[in-house]
Structure formats: structure tokens, C-alpha cells
């Protein structure tokens, strides 16, 4: 329901330049002057010879083929179509590849001129700047040059249904894959409107309580009944009428009635008996921690605040801040929790509500080939209707487009782009704090930064000696700790304890090369926690409980986690095909690359699939190895700590850490040397992996440091020049790929990769 163009910079002149470039691109695009832009970026007929064949090509056309190749994208798209058939939400914003060739250049310009007009825009500024000066500049340079245009862009709500809807569809499965247990089933409900402040957060809490939390009751009931290998859910709050979905993956459509029956029975039970208050508190605490912390990772905080504002501003111009000012909302929800508020939401929106749907997506082997044939036949039929002159015109237009794409941008146009001078760029780097301490024999790295009362704790445990035999088992172990029963808590209670005391409590692996020594690397399992200072000791107590008393021998729970991880990893590998290809290519060149891939990539997926498919055969050996790894890894002699907090807060961390470390075993009780039944072998170089997708991801890699080319900071400039110069023109502009990337990090692991690419051999 919106298109967002965003810029951010820490440099005021750069920010001003970017505003100029973006506002010019949005309000004065060259699409009105040059139809070839539409052909290149949207779609066009491609004809090299009057003898054929005629094909479609275009960047967005190929991008959307990639989008439509994902079964999860399909089910999400069908959910919205089922719930909002009479509104814009019932359509694919990027366009269906089957329908994109029906879009004419004229219709495209009409749509743009109507909706992409200043009268229909929302402009948002955030940061340390002279707001009056910026707003005056925007008005004088852009807004004042347009006459007011009355635009009816109101988001009309979907009228509620008299009866729930049902929709069934198919997605493509790769040739040779079994269709057994590969279907999706979803239970979906519209949940009020986005201007209800309490609902907005309450359903995010219910998302955790019902499905996403470890041992969540609805999810557990579905898992226990064998409905799917993975149960997921999401709450889409960023549209006019939010909706909540529960999805079973890797199931059978024949289980649809049982799926719905179990969900409704569990929801009715929760309404009747009441929701676990610890679970509600855990969900509220987790959301409130994230809200107060306001850490958006690599995304600028101001950008994320702006995007959240649109969750209300777009639907009521007088309410832009209702969701980014939420202290009162959290307070209200804690009070309402005691009065059955969350139970009433379940009854109203998930049980009694008729504005809901059941959607299924079943696999169909060969559907991609069927779609490709239909597309080719459509092009052939159109080609057969053309006269000789029309064919010659298409050949000429194809040649003209190619020449247009190959022509360098005129110098006078390049000189219009506002640039920074060297004097505009500050030479002073941001300060880096890395204070090394020895705390009773353990190395501690203190990063002295203001963190607003939060400790960011990292514990590093050396795993390098274990990788050769146990790499995939180590990765599996990171998914188990904190997600299984302990001596003192079942998995649900333990998960609630974590979220009531910490903002983060996770395990992961990290492999890192030594600077300028590409063959040398370190490998760690990392425990990460975010915690308010006053709860640090409690979090260390929970960590001690998890490391020493986790019930890894619970075969049922182990099978659940293996199955869930295999399903989730498969989709991640497919949807992020560019990352999958790069990591696989890098695995050929070094032991570190091989082990990293064995813990995160295709090799790890194959390990999980083999363990899942033959669980009874491998479970005992796997459990023995996991227990051995717990003893081998989590010892004092393998531990290093990192803490990020202000200097005056450090002592509180050290006090709690020392108490925890004193209870850690110095070394493993006994040498672990258990032969794994599932091994991972060296990979063959130059591989191809077949999927049901209609586009490719093509990668090449190699280590330039090992070949005698030392790393230099200028390679960051080279990366930008290649990505937006040669590679952009050859792979995206001419080739039709949606994206192309490259990287030259200090480790020397260089790579090139395309994204949603219709070509393979040409790109390679």
C-alpha cells in the first residue's frame, strides 16, 4: 500500500546530496523521456532474428520469477488474496510474471503520474539537522514546483466475510523430489485495524505465546499430532487491517481438517483455562526490551522509526506516533492481562471471527517446466501473428535497446550528480574501545560504551579442535541449548524464565580468519545475552542451568528440533540463493570455508536431512556426541568473555561473571573421541544445484591474498565501482538479473555472485 524511498547519512552534505538525487528521481524520473527504461527495468519482447525465437526479458520480470518460485512467498501471497480479495492487498505489488507483459508503457506512466505526485507523498526527516532549513529547501527545490492534485489513495478496508474463505493452490517442486509431506496449510484471521494501539502489540505477544515460544501450546499440539515438520506463524501489523497466520510446513493437504480442529480446540482451551501468565509476561518483556533498546542492527534507527510510523500515519494523518510511543501501551497491557484481555482477543479474532481463511499449497512436480512451456507458447503464438515488417521492427527495437544499454552515460549527465570533496569527509575514525583484562585466569574484553543500562555479553568457547569430526553436530547443539527441558524447568518454563530476564539468550558459531593470514583462523561457539544490569546474575544462573542440566537425551524433542531446522534451513538456502552459492564456492578453498559451510550451508542441510530421515538409526550416536560436546566445549580453559557497557557499570558484570566462572569445570572430565555415524566429506568443485526456481544464482570465488595480492582498503572502492559499473551493466542491465554483487574482504575471500538471474553460462 506504499512505496518508500529512503536515504540516510552521517554526513550533512552527503545527506543533502542524497535528498537531491532521490527527490529528483522520484518526482522527475526519466521514464517520461525514454521508453527504453521501461523495457529494460520492466519488460520487453526480445528478438535477435526474424526467424525467432521471441522471448520476454526485463529486470523486474525476472525478479518476480524468483519471487514466485518460493513456496513460502506463494502461501503468504495466497493468504492475503484470500483475506482481502476486494482491496489492493489481494494483488502482488511486484507483479505476477504471467501478467507483467500485459502492462503497457502508457498505463505505467498514467499510474505513476497519478500516485507518485507530491500531493500524495509523506515526507519524514529524522536526525540532528536544521529541520526548518531542510524543509524550506525541499519546498523551494521541489514541492513548490507542483500544483496540488487531489488523489484518492485512501486504503479501503475489506468488508468482513459472512463465512470463512478457503483457497488451494500449487507450487513447483524440482524434478526427482518426492511430493510426500511437502504441502503447506495455513489458518488466517484478520485482527481489527492498525490504529488500535493495544491490539498492535497484543497480537505480537500472542504470536509468541501461541506459536513462536519454545513449547508454545498451539504449536506443541500440532507437532505432537504429526501435523507438519515445522509450525510457524506471523503477525502482519504494517497494513490497514492486520492479520495473524498459523502455518504448517511439510505436511499433507489431507490433514487440513485435523489441523484446523487442533488449533481451535487448543485456542478454546486457552480461553477457558486461561493463558499461562509467565508466557504472557515473557512475551511482553521481550517486546518491551526491544522497544526500549531500539537496536535495529545494521539499519539506521531513524529509518526504522519512520517505517513504523507508516503503520498508523498512512491510515490516519493525525496519528503518526501512536506505535513509536508505546510506554503507556505496555503498562496498559500488563493491567489488562489480569482481566482476561488476551483470552478475549483469541475468542473474538481467532475463534468467533468469520473474516478468516484456510489456505493450502501443494507441490506439483514439473510445474516450473509447465510454466516455462506456457510462456514460450504464448510468445510463439504472438510471434506467429506478426507480419514480416513487425518482426523486423522488433529485431530493430531489440538492437536499439542493446545499444542503449551499452552506451556510456554522457559526461554532462555524470557531472550533474552532486559529489563530496575529500575535505567534506571526516578523517577521524569513530573511537574503538577494546580493553583486555585478566579476570581470575579468563581473558575478558571490555568495550567501554554507553549502553543505557544494558549489558551486552558474549562468551566465546574455542571449538577449532573439534571441527574436523563434529562441525555439523556443533551447529545442531546451538539449536538445542535453551530449547530443551532442564532439571529444574520444562522447556516452556525455561523459555519464559529467559525472556523475563533477558533480551537475548542465544548460541551461535563464529569462524574468523586472522588478519593477513588467510590460512590461520579461530573458531568459537558463542553465547550472547542482552540483559539489564540488575538481572545479570540471574541470567548467568540460567546459563549455568542450561549448560549443566539440559536434557539432550530427550529423543522426542531432538527429533522435533532436527525436523524444524531441516525445514527452515532448506527454505533459507533456496530463498537466499546468492548467499548459498557464495558460501558453497568459498568452501572449496580452505578448511575454514569447509567447516563454515558444514555448519550453515548445503552440507549442514544434508546432515540434518540424513539424521531426520534415519533418526532411529542415528539418534543414540547423535545424543552421545552432543553430550560429549557439552563437556568438551563449555570449560573454563576454552572460554573468553566480551562485555559492552560503560566503564562505571563494568564492576557489576565482573562480579556476576566471576561467580559463574568459578562453577565452570576447568577442563573436560574425560577425553571425548566418539566416531560420528554421519560424516561430511570434501565437496567437489564447480557444482550446480537444481531447484524448482525459474532463475539462477551464479557465484565465483577465490582467495586473492593466497595468490600474493595483499588486502588494501581501496578494494572497498573497487567493490563499489564493479558492483555499480561493469557488473551492473553486464549482468543486470544487459543480462536481466535483478542484482549482482562482489566482495573483497581483508581475509582475501573474494567473490562475485548474481541474484535472480535468468542467465547461467553467460553470467559465469
Predicted regions and their residues:
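Short beta-strand/turn micro-motifs at beta-sheet edges
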Residues: 110-112, 172-176, 231-236, 445-447, ...
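M16 family metallopeptidases and their MPP-like homologs
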Residues: 1-28, 35-47, 73-98, 120-126, ...
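His/Glu-based metal-binding/catalytic segments typifying zinc-dependent metallopeptidases
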Residues: 61-73, 151-215, 300-319, 323, ...
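Extended, regular secondary-structure scaffolds
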Residues: 110, 122, 131-152, 273, ...
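Non-catalytic, conformational "gating/processing" segments within enzyme and secreted inhibitor domains
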Residues: 57, 106-141, 596, 600-601, ...
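Hydrophobic, small-residue-rich alpha-helical packing segments that form membrane-like cores
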Residues: 45-120, 124-175, 179-181, 186
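Core subunits and conserved enzymes of cellular information-processing
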Residues: 346-349
Amino acid at each position: 500500500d506504499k512505496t518508500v524511498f529512503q536515504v540516510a547519512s552521517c554526513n550533512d552534505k552527503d545527506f543533502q546530496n542524497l535528498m537531491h538525487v532521490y527527490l529528483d528521481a522520484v518526482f522527475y524520473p526519466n521514464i517520461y523521456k525514454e521508453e527504453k527504461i521501461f523495457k529494460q527495468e520492466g519488460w520487453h519482447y526480445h528478438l535477435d532474428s526474424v526467424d525467432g525465437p521471441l522471448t520476454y526479458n526485463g529486470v523486474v520480470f525476472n525478479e518476480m520469477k524468483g519471487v514466485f518460485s518460493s513456496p513460502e512467498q506463494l502461501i503468504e501471497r495466497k493468504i492475503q488474496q484470500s483475506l482481502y480479495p476486494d482491496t489492493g492487498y489481494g494483488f502482488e505489488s511486484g507483479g505476477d510474471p504471467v501478467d507483467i507483459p500485459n502492462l503497457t508503457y502508457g498505463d505505467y506512466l498514467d499510474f505513476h503520474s497519478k500516485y507518485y505526485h507530491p500531493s500524495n507523498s509523506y515526507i519524514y526527516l529524522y536526525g540532528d539537522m536544521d529541520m526548518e532549513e531542510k524543509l524550506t529547501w525541499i519546498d523551494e527545490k521541489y514541492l513548490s514546483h507542483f500544483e496540488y492534485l487531489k488523489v484518492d489513495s485512501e486504503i479501503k478496508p475489506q468488508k468482513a466475510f459472512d463465512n470463512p474463505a478457503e483457497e488451494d493452490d500449487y507450487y513447483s517442486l524440482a524434478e526427482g523430489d518426492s511430493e510426500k509431506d511437502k504441502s503447506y496449510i495455513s489458518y488466517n484471521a484478520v485482527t481489527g485495524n492498525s490504529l488500535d494501539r493495544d491490539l498492535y502489540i497484543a497480537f505480537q505477544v500472542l504470536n509468541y505465546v501461541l506459536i513462536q515460544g519454545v513449547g508454545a501450546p498451539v504449536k506443541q499440539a500440532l507437532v505432537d499430532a504429526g501435523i507438519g515438520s515445522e509450525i510457524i506463524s506471523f503477525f502482519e501489523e504494517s497494513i490497514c487491517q492486520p492479520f495473524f497466520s498459523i502455518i504448517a510446513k511439510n505436511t499433507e493437504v489431507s490433514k487440513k481438517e485435523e489441523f484446523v480442529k487442533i488449533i481451535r480446540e487448543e485456542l478454546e482451551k486457552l480461553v477457558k483455562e486461561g493463558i499461562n501468565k509467565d508466557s504472557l509476561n515473557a512475551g511482553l518483556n521481550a517486546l518491551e526490551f526491544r522497544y526500549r533498546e531500539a537496536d535495529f542492527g545494521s539499519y539506521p534507527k531513524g529509518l526504522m522509526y519512520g517505517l513504523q510510523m507508516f503503520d498508523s500515519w498512512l491510515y490516519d494523518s493525525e496519528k503518526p506516533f501512536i506505535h513509536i510511543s508505546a510506554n503507556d501501551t505496555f503498562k496498559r497491557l500488563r493491567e489488562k492481562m489480569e482481566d482476561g484481555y488476551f483470552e478475549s482477543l483469541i475468542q473474538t479474532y481467532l475463534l468467533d471471527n468469520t473474516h478468516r481463511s484456510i489456505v493450502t499449497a501443494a507441490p506439483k512436480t514439473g510445474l516450473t517446466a509447465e510454466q516455462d512451456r506456457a510462456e514460450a507458447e504464448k510468445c510463439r503464438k504472438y510471434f506467429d501473428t506478426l507480419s514480416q515488417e513487425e518482426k523486423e521492427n522488433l529485431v530493430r527495437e531489440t538492437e536499439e535497446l542493446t545499444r542503449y544499454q551499452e552506451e556510456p552515460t554522457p559526461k554532462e549527465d555524470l557531472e550533474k550528480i552532486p559529489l563530496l570533496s575529500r575535505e567534506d569527509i571526516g578523517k577521524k575514525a569513530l573511537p574503538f574501545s577494546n580493553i583486555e583484562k585478566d579476570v581470575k585466569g579468563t581473558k575478558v574484553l571490555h568495550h567501554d560504551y554507553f549502553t543505557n543500562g544494558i549489558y551486552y555479553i558474549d562468551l566465546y568457547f574455542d571449538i577449532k579442535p573439534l571441527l574436523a569430526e563434529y562441525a555439523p553436530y556443533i551447529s545442531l547443539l546451538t539449536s538445542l541449548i535453551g530449547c530443551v527441558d532442564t532439571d529444574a524447568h520444562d522447556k516452556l518454563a525455561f523459555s519464559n524464565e529467559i525472556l523475563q530476564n533477558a533480551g537475548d539468550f542465544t548460541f551461535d558459531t563464529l569462524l574468523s580468519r586472522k588478519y593477513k593470514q588467510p590460512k590461520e583462523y579461530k573458531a568459537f561457539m558463542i553465547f550472547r545475552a542482552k540483559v539489564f544490569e540488575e538481572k545479570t546474575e540471574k541470567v548467568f544462573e540460567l546459563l549455568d542451568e542450561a549448560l549443566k542440566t539440559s536434557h539432550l537425551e530427550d529423543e522426542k524433542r531432538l527429533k522435533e528440533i532436527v525436523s524444524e531446522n531441516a525445514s527452515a534451513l532448506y527454505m533459507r538456502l533456496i530463498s537466499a540463493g546468492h548467499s548459498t552459492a557464495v558460501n558453497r564456492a568459498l568452501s572449496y578453498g580452505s578448511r575454514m570455508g569447509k567447516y563454515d559451510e558444514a555448519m550453515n550451508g548445503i552440507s549442514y542441510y544434508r546432515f540434518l536431512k540424513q539424521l531426520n530421515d534415519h533418526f532411529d538409526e542415528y539418534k543414540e550416536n547423535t545424543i552421545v556426541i552432543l553430550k560429549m560436546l557439552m563437556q568438551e566445549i563449555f570449560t573454563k580453559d576454552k572460554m573468553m568473555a566480551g562485555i559492552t557497557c560503560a566503564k562505571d557499570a563494568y564492576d557489576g558484570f565482573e562480579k556476576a561473571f566471576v561467580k559463574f566462572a568459578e562453577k565452570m569445570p576447568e577442563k573436560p572430565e574425560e577425553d571425548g573421541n566418539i566416531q560420528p555415524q554421519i560424516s561430511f566429506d570434501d565437496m567437489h568443485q564447480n557444482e550446480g544445484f537444481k531447484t524448482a526456481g525459474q532463475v539462477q544464482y551464479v557465484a565465483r570465488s577465490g582467495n586473492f591474498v593466497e595468490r600474493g595480492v595483499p588486502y588494501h582498503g581501496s578494494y572497498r572502492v573497487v567493490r563499489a565501482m564493479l558492483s555499480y559499473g561493469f557488473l551492473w551493466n553486464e549482468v543486470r542491465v544487459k543480462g536481466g538479473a535483478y542484482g549482482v554483487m562482489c566482495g573483497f574482504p581483508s581475509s582475501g575471500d573474494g567473490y562475485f555472485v548474481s541474484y535472480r538471474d535468468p542467465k547461467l553460462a553467460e553470467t559465469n
